Amino acid sequence: MKGRHGEEGPIRRWAGGPAGDETILLDMHVHSTCSRDSLIPVKVILKTWETLGILSVICDHNTTHGSELLAREMHIRGSDIPVIIAEEILTLQGEIIGLFLSEEIPPYLTAAETLDRIHDQGALSLVPHPFCTFRTTSLGRSGLDRLNGRIDLVEGYNSRVLREHENLLARAYAMEKGKPITAGSDAHTKAELGQTWLAVPPFGSPREFLRSLPEARVYFRPAGLEARPVAPW
């Protein structure tokens, strides 16, 4: 395997996943105890992967430490599936997630500078919960419009978004602008793990992951409800 992005080397394949055939199951938004507001140790996140086959993308607040710990533990266990090193970064305009990072990005930069730093690493940018009104850290429509040409992905399903229409607005925006969508539980407690995930074809790099998303299936459960397959849009 080459670096963190897995440009070389085999990818772990999941036979008989919910998308059929060989898929990788990814919960694209999970917080570990490396985020001060989360109660989930990395070892519990690892156990979810071992028991359910759902690999969490740990997006801790302003640090990559949680996803680095997960990558280390999976390496110790002999896994060759590439772990996505990620961080949910608080910018001056709102939160942005960097995926496939090789270096941690500091908070409190402008959104534009944060996006530059993400892309300078060959990484991908994801806007989480963009229309969620109970958070003060969502970018909103105006922020999305200003940054549209520099955004790679939009979070279309977030289990912690309480108003269903706000997830729908995110998916509608992504479709309007031609952006792939992701899905995540935004888990901060153990009970939330495994609520929402993507079933994607195997990938070995950020660009391969990006290209795999149109083929992904989404399994979504709002907090407290049963997971169910949904149409991407």
Model-derived features: positions:
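Ser/Thr-glycine-rich phosphate-binding loops at phosphate-binding pockets of nucleotides
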Residues: 32-33, 56-63
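Active-site substrate-binding loop(s) of clan PA
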Residues: 107-108, 120
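Short beta-strand/loop segments at the ligand-binding rim of alpha/beta enzyme cores
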Residues: 120-130
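Short, conserved beta-strand segments within well-ordered enzyme catalytic domains
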Residues: 27, 56-58, 82-84
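Conserved beta-strand positions
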Residues: 58-61, 127, 156-159
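Charged catalytic cores and adjacent phosphate/nucleic-acid-binding surfaces used
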Residues: 1-38, 42-47, 52, 68-71, ...
